[in-house]
Amino acid sequence: MNETQIQRETRQVVEDVLEKTNLKQGVLFVLGLSSSEVLGGQIGKESSQEIGELIVETILGILGSRGIHLAVQGCEHVNRALVVERQVAEQFDLEIVSVHPTLHAGGSGQLAAFKFMQDPVEVEFIKAHAGLDIGDTAIGMHVKHVQVPIRPILREIGHAHVTALASRPKLIGGARAHYPQDAIRKS
């Protein structure tokens, strides 16, 4: 698998999702990543630390330049806990849990987050404003309501299927209520 191509595809998809979601500085963005799927394998079966590092480092750079906080979701072996910076956990009052990821429990993305973040910790649950799912890892439990599917510019990174979610405020009030337009809500 060509690492330059994976990095280029990752950059394209993340920048496209950020443009479509119009995220503001200071919000949370969740990443679900199967390096096995990126390489054309089955999720959890052919994990690659190198691919995890390539993708997470690329995404951290893009989000960091915009002041958006990355949360990297682990697999079910760590109950889909997430790696964030300690400062983010404290700022959002997230519950820190005791686990250190491995390649096959947490996954390559979490290992990469531990490598590239300044002071990484694992947290049990977040409510992100948006997220990217590389390889059908199921990020929905960590994206706030109301979730809106986003179609990224590319459908795959490497061989992995790619989807994205954004969120919008709930519409309440009924027939007489009026709602402001937003870029995410469908007509």
Swiss-Prot record:
InterPro entries: Antibiotic_NAT-like, DUF436. It comes from the Bacteria. Gene3D superfamilies: Hypothetical protein TT1679. NCBIfam families: TIGR01440 family protein. Belongs to the UPF0340 family. This is UPF0340 protein SPH_0758. The lineage of its organism: Bacteria, Bacillati, Bacillota, Bacilli, Lactobacillales.
